[in-house]
Amino acid sequence: MKCFQKLYIFILILIVLMAGCESNKITGDSKETQIKKSFAKTLDVYPTKNLEDFYDKEGYRDGEFKKGDKGKWVIRSEMTTELKNENMVSKGMVIRLNRNSRTCTGEYFVRIVKEDSEGKVYSDERKYPVKMENNKIITLKPIDDEKVKKEIEEFKFFVQYGNFKELENYKDGEVTYNPEAPIYSAQYQLKNSDYNVEQLRKRYNITTKKAPKLLLKGSGNLKGSSVGYKNIEFTFVENKEENIYFTDSINFNPSEDK
């Protein structure tokens, strides 16, 4: 009889544990879906070939916006490469499209992170101010470096050619969520045949053949927030000796001029 009672209790505990595991699984899947939906609102603008279209695009608005403020779009794309025994080099551009004045300014930047003989790390960054007119990036100051000048002339933001129509097909992501911060993320292993991976390889000298991981990382309310951020990162290589990754972000904020 005692054996039967012990067996009954054991089975009961097992059922409760299994139910708890299943409950956690459902919650996890639900959170991944929520993160996807939160990012979908931002990723829907990919691709937007003509950047001036953002003057007429409305973003998420909350109490941070003053009355009459149409807001501004902040768009940033950056490629970082650190090969073995070489400096880490980041090149990219950020622009701010003011929907009130329908003007756009920003800067192209080149950042080099170096390590001296004593192991001290320091950063050297150069910024080149730009503006946008008729969907064309124009430098505001003369540039002597022909290589940099060409990089600016040929620069395209990821939002102009990226496409996330396959987002729903990304499965089994590594999901993290901290409701206190709040910070959330979902990471997926991609294939080299992925459209966005192919586009990045066409435009950048990516030396590795490894397929990247896609990280969707955000902060603020999952339902929307003008004070949070949403970043996209394609990581091809990440270790102590080498790093190759591409980052992109599009955020809608108060313009601060109202």
Swiss-Prot record:
Topology term for the membrane: Lipid-anchor
Record NCBIfam families: SA_tandem_lipo
Family (UniProt): Belongs to the staphylococcal tandem lipoprotein family.
Any one Gene Ontology cellular component term annotated for this protein: plasma membrane
InterPro entries found in the cross-reference section: Csa (IPR007595), Csa_sf (IPR038641)
Listed Gene3D superfamilies: 2.50.20.40
Ribosomal protein in keyword set: no
The keyword Cell membrane is assigned to this record: yes
Residues making up the signal peptide according to the UniProt record: 1-20
PROSITE patterns registered for this protein in UniProt: PROKAR_LIPOPROTEIN
Location relative to the cell: Cell membrane
Keywords: Cell membrane, Lipoprotein, Membrane, Palmitate, Signal
Superkingdom classification of source: Bacteria
Lipidation (N-palmitoyl cysteine): C21
Covalently attached lipid (S-diacylglycerol cysteine), positions: C21
Pfam families reported in the protein's UniProt record: DUF576 (PF04507)
Protein's name in the database: Uncharacterized lipoprotein SAUSA300_0416
Primary location recorded for the protein, binned into one broad class: membrane
